[in-house]
């Protein structure tokens, strides 16, 4: 395959990386079993100035879902699970309010269950989360609409553990990582620490890039915790391009199981990313999105989590694949789609395009700080008008203190578990999951909590203390905009 990304194109990518404060980026385009064209730009550690390599690992975030779907599909081949029977037939403790919930519903995002991303990560076990699922609310009718849900993939991984007595991580290694020779891939924080070649995660706040601590994703590995390298992700995508067969000719997934993974089970309504967008997203299978690119079918998935972004895509009829990763949380649309479209156009269709330039002009490089709109989209405010309209200065300090009895204590919710309220240096603090955050006074028993991490979002949420039984309090926290506050 003729080299697609020459010096001029690579320089354009590097200019955009500099503009968006991207520390490092790696990508590969490949056809069939030919030598992939790989490029490693920038740095895995911006402070130490250490360069990217094809073996450098990234958190793959939601691309992990394609691995989980493969593990569950393998267990279906072995008769230990079934996509179309209620999951309680196999894992009785994994109960939902919707009693007909199947693994296919869970892994195609059609369950109707609200996101509930506040549940993870943390020090809970997957078994504990499984016992909490029966208490969680839906916000859509069952099987009515596509709604992305990380928690359901965590539970699909737990189902695999429950029927085998082995950890999801060991199943992944035995069924796929080992046979595919993916020696630069793991699914634990310990694996990240041991590899010695992990890209450091970064995120932009305002207009300044900050290095982040690694976010322990061990609980949520089946949804977002697999880490891998460019070398290994090329192997993973090629395995799917070959229909579930290794390069040595060994079939790891039956044709039926592979077909179920890559067949849409729910439609997706998606707007074009840019005018004249050649990529049309149509549906979701099991851990893979699908649609057409220039009228040709594709399979893809993207991932985004604390400090990392990634995309995998392949066109089966063109025997062409593409993988890209960077150690920055957003803005993947401008960079990723521009590079990806240029790569696919030339590799699969023989068209020399300039999508990167178009994305730059239409979505990015306009005005001194225009590109930073991409970062502002990572923040959401769930506070309602009665919170937003209050002058917090009027209720701060001694006057506000007199309004409250002792709010400290441990509060429980059967679906969300335990949170703790305590006072530190005169400020009320709320501990939940892996975060300790200050409660900013609003009025009466109302507070606002900033900096709540849920999946890819940083949230501002309202917190209210309401009178409870025996003269105590209940804590109401609005962790999900589509649901009433969670009552602890």
Predicted regions and their residues:
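Catalytic loop of the DD-peptidase/beta-lactamase superfamily, centered on the K-T-G motif
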Residues: 1-40, 166, 170-174, 178, ...
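Active-site-proximal loop and beta-strand segments within enzyme catalytic domains
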Residues: 3-4, 18-19, 23, 31, ...
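Hydrophobic aliphatic residues
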Residues: 91, 107-111, 180, 240, ...
């Amino acid at each position: 395959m003729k080299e697609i990304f020459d010096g001029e194109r690579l320089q354009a990518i590097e200019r955009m990386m500099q503009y968006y404060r991207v520390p490092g980026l790696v990508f590969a385009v490949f056809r069939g079993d030919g030598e992939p064209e790989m490029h490693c730009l920038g740095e895995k550690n911006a402070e130490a100035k250490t360069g990217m390599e094809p073996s450098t690992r990234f958190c793959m975030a939601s691309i992990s879902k394609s691995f989980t779907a493969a593990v569950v599909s393998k267990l279906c081949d072995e008769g230990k699970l079934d996509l179309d029977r209620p999951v309680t037939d196999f894992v009785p403790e994994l109960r939902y309010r919707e009693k007909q919930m199947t693994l296919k519903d869970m892994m195609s995002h059609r369950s109707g269950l609200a996101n509930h991303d506040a549940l993870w990560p943390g020090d809970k076990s997957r078994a504990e989360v499984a016992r909490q699922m029966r208490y969680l609310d839906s916000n859509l009718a069952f099987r009515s609409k596509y709604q992305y849900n990380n928690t359901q993939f965590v539970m699909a991984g737990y189902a695999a553990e429950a029927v085998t007595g082995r950890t999801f991580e060991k199943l992944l290694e035995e069924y796929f990582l080992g046979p595919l020779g993916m020696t630069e891939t793991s699914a634990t924080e310990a694996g990240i620490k041991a590899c010695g070649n992990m890209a450091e995660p970064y995120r932009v706040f305002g207009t300044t890039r900050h290095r982040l601590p690694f976010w322990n994703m061990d609980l949520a590995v089946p949804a977002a915790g697999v880490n891998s390298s460019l070398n290994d992700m090329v192997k993973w995508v090629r395995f799917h391009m070959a229909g579930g067969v290794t390069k040595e000719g060994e079939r790891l997934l039956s044709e039926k199981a592979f077909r179920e993974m890559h067949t849409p089970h729910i439609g997706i309504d998606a707007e074009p990313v840019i005018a004249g967008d050649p990529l049309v997203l149509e549906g979701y299978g099991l851990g893979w999105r699908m649609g057409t690119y220039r009228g040709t079918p594709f399979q893809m998935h993207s991932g985004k989590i604390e400090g990392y972004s990634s995309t995998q895509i392949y066109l089966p009829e063109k025997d062409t694949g593409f993988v890209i990763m960077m150690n920055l949380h957003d803005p993947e649309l401008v960079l990723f789609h521009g590079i990806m479209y240029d790569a696919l156009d030339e590799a699969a269709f023989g068209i020399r395009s300039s999508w990167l330039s178009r994305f730059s002009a239409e979505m990015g490089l306009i005005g001194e700080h225009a590109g930073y709109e991409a970062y502002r989209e990572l923040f959401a405010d769930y506070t309602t008008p009665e919170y937003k309209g209050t002058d917090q200065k009027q209720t701060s300090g001694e006057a506000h203190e007199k309004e409250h009895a002792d709010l400290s204590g441990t509060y429980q919710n059967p679906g969300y578990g335990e949170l703790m309220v305590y006072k530190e240096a005169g400020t009320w603090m709320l501990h939940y999951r892996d975060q300790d955050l200050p409660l900013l006074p609003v009025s009466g028993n109302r507070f606002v909590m900033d900096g709540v991490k849920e999946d890819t979002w940083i949230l501002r949420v309202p917190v209210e203390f309401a009178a409870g039984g025996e003269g105590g309090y209940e804590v109401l926290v609005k962790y999900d905009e589509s649901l009433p506050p969670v009552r602890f």
